[in-house]
Amino acid sequence: MFDFMTLEKVWEKGPLVHNITNIVVANDSANGLLAIGASPIMGSAKEEMDELAKMADVLVINIGTLDGELVTAMKIAGRAANVAGTPVVLDPVGVGATSYRRKVVQELLAEIQFTAIRGNAGELAAIAGEAWEAKGVDAGVGSADVLSIAEKVANEWSTVVIISGEVDVISDGTRFAKVANGSALLPRITGSGCLLSAVCGSFMAVQDDAFRASVEACASYAVASEYAEIELERKLPGSFRPQFLDALASWSVEKTRAKAKIQESGEHK
């Protein structure tokens, strides 16, 4: 099923990815999207949301650094994207960390139909209402089953769920996949998950099956990180960051197929 031709479609079509993202990761997200052949726009003024929704091929909403004006812009953009039939991705950064973040995410989920939600296990557990000890915006620890969390959120909100970790878990509520790739250096650079959300969005912009797009995006991204680590003389995050950008710029269907470790199942048992 996963032939990774979605990767080629991103190069061919150069989708316009509208990011309403946080101030920590905006530059890296934009550069990462450019590296894979997508076209980023980082507009966040509420006055331009309707126009941007008509232009963009996908909208990615990231709650990393919130304020009231930005939340208003997110809601306007999300509703406009729904009307336009544009895919919308939510990255609920640190949703379990504060009551304000939980409130904002619940409002966004109530007002916008998201094509996909991507976060770490702690963030998705918070959305699912499962017990989890979050550590700020990091995943933290918990005893809930990650597959069950993915299934619950996917079915409750009619969306694809992507839970990032040592093994990524992807589900649309009926289909499940695990991606067992990735460099250990990825979580040591800030914004690697935020960029993955944007990359998933770019794949959804050119592939109607959001589940397939998500699996192929996660695998391609993780494999690129492995190739980046191979090139390093010193396995350190400062060296890894630019090397990873280069790996994204030089990724290919053949490279990804050669290393991708995907386990797919039709149901969660």
Curated annotation (Swiss-Prot):
Cofactor: Mg(2+)
Record keywords: ATP-binding, Kinase, Magnesium, Metal-binding, Nucleotide-binding, Thiamine biosynthesis, Transferase
InterPro entries: Hyethyz_kinase, Ribokinase-like
Top class in the EC scheme: transferase
Pathway recorded for this protein: Cofactor biosynthesis; thiamine diphosphate biosynthesis; 4-methyl-5-(2-phosphoethyl)-thiazole from 5-(2-hydroxyethyl)-4-methylthiazole: step 1/1
EC number from the UniProt entry: 2.7.1.50
Binding residues for ATP: R118, S164
Pfam families: HK
UniProt catalytic activity: 5-(2-hydroxyethyl)-4-methylthiazole + ATP = 4-methyl-5-(2-phosphooxyethyl)-thiazole + ADP + H(+)
CDD domains listed in its UniProt record: THZ_kinase (cd01170)
Binding site for substrate: M42, G191
Keyword Cytoplasm in annotation: no
Molecular functions (GO terms): ATP binding; hydroxyethylthiazole kinase activity; magnesium ion binding
Biological process (GO), any one: thiamine biosynthetic process
Gene3D superfamilies referenced in this protein's UniProt entry, alphabetically: 3.40.1190.20
Family note: Belongs to the Thz kinase family.
Function recorded in the entry: Catalyzes the phosphorylation of the hydroxyl group of 4-methyl-5-beta-hydroxyethylthiazole (THZ).
HAMAP family: Thz_kinase
Protein name, UniProt field: Hydroxyethylthiazole kinase
Annotated organism of origin: Listeria monocytogenes serotype 4b (strain F2365)
Protein encoded by which gene: thiM
